[in-house]
């Protein structure tokens, strides 16, 4: 049986959110905050708060960013290979043979694998 933390980690890490396209991650995150106080600003930042008693311990702030390593399709070859360019920083040596999800402009998720 999975813990709530494991469920959330799986949900967030499997939600597509390449740099500049974090809308789906933001939507999933806000859905999970249902019932808790939160707000979102025009830049896409989500702020959430949970009331507590100061006598219970120190205040804690958690911060994270929603985007992940991503690529943009530059070209599709005649043989069907997709040529990509990175969005943000990445390490080329860890990408080979990794599974990817190609998000079509229609919103369709297409599974793939990085080849050399």
Please identify what each model-predicted range represents.
Residues 1-116:
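N-terminal hydrophobic/helix-forming segments and targeting peptides
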């Amino acid at each position: 049986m999975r813990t709530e933390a494991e469920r959330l980690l799986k949900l967030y890490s499997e939600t597509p959110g390449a740099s500049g396209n974090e809308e789906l991650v933001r939507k999933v995150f806000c859905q999970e905050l249902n019932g808790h106080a939160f707000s979102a600003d025009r830049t896409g930042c989500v702020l959430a708060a949970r009331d507590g008693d100061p006598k219970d311990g120190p205040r804690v702030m958690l911060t994270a960013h929603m985007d992940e390593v991503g690529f943009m399709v530059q070209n599709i070859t005649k043989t069907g290979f997709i040529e990509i360019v990175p969005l943000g920083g990445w390490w080329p040596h860890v990408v080979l043979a990794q599974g990817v999800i190609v998000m079509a402009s229609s919103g369709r998720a297409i599974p793939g694998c990085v080849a050399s």
